[in-house]
């Protein structure tokens, strides 16, 4: 990795200050299913159970450019009957420069999805409202906790793989 430098006017050089820029945001995939309509739109005695899943993926595009995709899916059920299913993959192209290598994964898996989340949340709310239901306002997500859990799971997988390799 190269370090960009700039002159500060007295002949000495200084490192480029860290920067994170959003180059683009986009809907990669959006699906809304309302299989029981119009019966599913009738008033209910109780609130439906809602199951929400969240995932984050990041892939390099160029030296400092990354594609980060926040995937949200939500299913609402009344007993065993599905009321709706919404799935969204919302992406952003980020330019990341001047950060130490050890900060890159947390930046891509915590900060980038944190910037994308309000937009993805609004798209899901609009889709459920347009489907005839009250808007689904997803609670804020702790991306730092998700990242820590992901790293712990990868560490366990690596340990299991090492154990299996030494056993053979």
UniProtKB/Swiss-Prot annotation:
Top-rank taxon: Bacteria
InterPro entries: SecB, SecB-like_sf
Major subcellular location class: cytoplasm
One Gene Ontology term from the biological process aspect of the record: protein transport
Positions in coiled-coil regions: none
Function: One of the proteins required for the normal export of preproteins out of the cell cytoplasm. It is a molecular chaperone that binds to a subset of precursor proteins, maintaining them in a translocation-competent state. It also specifically binds to its receptor SecA.
Family under the similarity heading: Belongs to the SecB family.
Record's protein name: Protein-export protein SecB
UniProt organism field: Rhizobium meliloti (strain 1021)
Gene: secB
């Amino acid at each position: 990795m190269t370090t960009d430098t700039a002159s500060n006017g007295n002949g000495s050089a200084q490192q480029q200050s860290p920067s994170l820029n959003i180059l683009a945001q986009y809907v990669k995939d959006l699906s809304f299913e309302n299989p029981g309509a119009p019966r599913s739109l009738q008033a209910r005695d109780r609130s439906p159970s809602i199951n929400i899943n969240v995932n984050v993926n990041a892939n390099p595009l160029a030296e400092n450019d990354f594609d980060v995709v926040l995937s949200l899916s939500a299913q609402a059920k009344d007993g065993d009957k599905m009321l709706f299913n919404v799935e969204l993959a919302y992406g952003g192209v980020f330019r990341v420069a001047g950060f130490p290598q050890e900060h890159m994964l947390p930046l891509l898996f915590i900060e980038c999805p944190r910037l994308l989340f309000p937009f993805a949340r609004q798209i899901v709310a609009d889709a459920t409202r347009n489907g005839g239901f009250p808007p689904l306002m997803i609670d804020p997500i702790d991306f730092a906790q998700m990242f820590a859990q992901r790293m712990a799971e990868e560490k366990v997988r690596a340990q299991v793989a090492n154990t299996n390799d030494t056993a053979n």
